[in-house]
């Protein structure tokens, strides 16, 4: 009989007043007993609606049933038959909008905690198993993957399992893409990403770092080197700004730069060549998951006051509820229904305040959310010494500008056939944020998986 508890088994977490001063992982993971108890809540539905909500097609009821039986390694094998990065997706996937959003248990009560169970299985395997993935027999065909982020790594893993000789070209000095530069340690430990990459290398995937495709090598040169197909998963790392006065002041960062300096470069250390500013009061403009990450990092780096400035209200926030909840627990101050007008500097060109105007919500706009309308005469100054802009990113134009025949849309995103993920160049495929603009890790993984299947079909005919 299923466990008919209406609520999930709670996830153990660090105390908010402790964790907001360190970069250790907030969520501490299920014990074996917790995992089995939570897994027993699954009804093993005949129609399996949860699977339809998973972009990488994990056979969810099957692996959950194995967890309930205490057969954790078997559960892991089921997960990794379709998901190359379970320890990552189990931590950062917005399950509430994907598999858990379709869980029947969520109709009356809380859905089964599929993400926590996936994470548990991956962590259990890392801790208890010395077994390495076995490299399949090569089929002799070479495929290049541009970008070692979630879409590129997923595509590489799926192709390697089919016997392709896969080389991943990564612009940074370490593999992981947004997983290492964008997502903080307290949400996704870098050791986890490193281990998942090593698992792919065991399958035969070669990773070459410090390789900026479009500068060091072009897409055409990759074809000349013998690669039969190319997947572009170069992400969307070009930050957007509001275009308001004062964005050139010292102390204004894009969230992309702030998080990269913090997560990847550890620029908060005193001996770093270009240290990040030691802030006392920080305003983060925007309210997506990236904004939450930036705000929570600023708090951990010693800022006394950290504000999230957003022109709409709590109900319109696109960030995951869990991330908003954690941010509020950690003392982040939400300044909703406020919009920046300009950033004010002192005589040394450093940020001293941000001028904002109060907003009110009108009728819904094209996004379906109520349109924010400025309240005339309500301007005020928010005293801050650092401003972090987190209002979106777009793909870097380097690859498209050096690759003839590669079409993009008006946002600079690569145009692909949505069924095959093939671009307007034969043999060139793309997925993830390079195609969609900034989106979720799991959607990028799904695109990488879809592209791998299409590349396999393409090369099987050629």
Predicted regions and their residues:
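Feature captures the FAD/FMN-dependent oxidoreductase FAD-binding
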Residues: 137, 142-146, 194-244, 342-351, ...
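Residue-level detector of alpha-helix initiation sites
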Residues: 84, 149-150, 174, 288-290, ...
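Glycine/serine-rich phosphate-binding loop and adjoining beta1-alpha1 elements at the start
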Residues: 52, 56-135, 201, 209, ...
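A conserved FAD-binding loop/helix module that cradles the flavin
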Residues: 434-461
